[in-house]
Amino acid sequence: GLIAYFPEPSFITKNDLALDCALTIRRLVYDGLNPVFEQNDYPGINVRIGLDSGDAYVVTIGSPATKSHKDIIGSIVSLSAKIQSLGGSGDILLGEVTERNLHTMWREICEEIELKKDWKYKGMDGEPYKVYKVKFR
């Protein structure tokens, strides 16, 4: 797994940057790495990506006397993982906040997905938190 953290230059810009990064990772894996793996009789790898926006904090776990490490914590980290788990191979899924704050050109390639009945996450309005999928041609 991989967690990417996009700190502020601006809230809106970081949503666009996060989606651009996700599209680049997907393209690199499926158009760059997998063809080379397959030519050498290795299985390709699959990725699915979940994005959302909100407060996250970079913290140091441990002390200088021990092997400390950095981690990213916050409810948004857990929600992004839950969003990612809804996808299939090659999918890029976005939470409602991320989709709403994307530039129009990015929003045009996203469509809301139907959520399973066991999806428990609610938005600020008390309604089920929406999830969007990036459409590929």
What does each of the following model-derived ranges do?
Residues 21-22:
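Short amphipathic C-terminal alpha-helix that caps PH/PH-like domains
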Residues 25:
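Serine endopeptidase catalytic core focused on the charge-relay Asp
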Residues 29-36, 105, 109:
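Solvent-exposed amphipathic alpha-helical surface segments
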Residues 89-137:
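Intrinsically disordered, glycine/charged-rich C-terminal tails and inter-domain linkers
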Residues 1-14, 33-73:
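Catalytic core of nucleotidyl cyclases, primarily class III adenylyl/guanylyl cyclases
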Residues 28, 32, 86-89:
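Conserved, well-folded catalytic cores of nucleic-acid-processing
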Residues 52, 75-100:
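Catalytic/regulatory signature loops of cyclic-dinucleotide turnover enzymes
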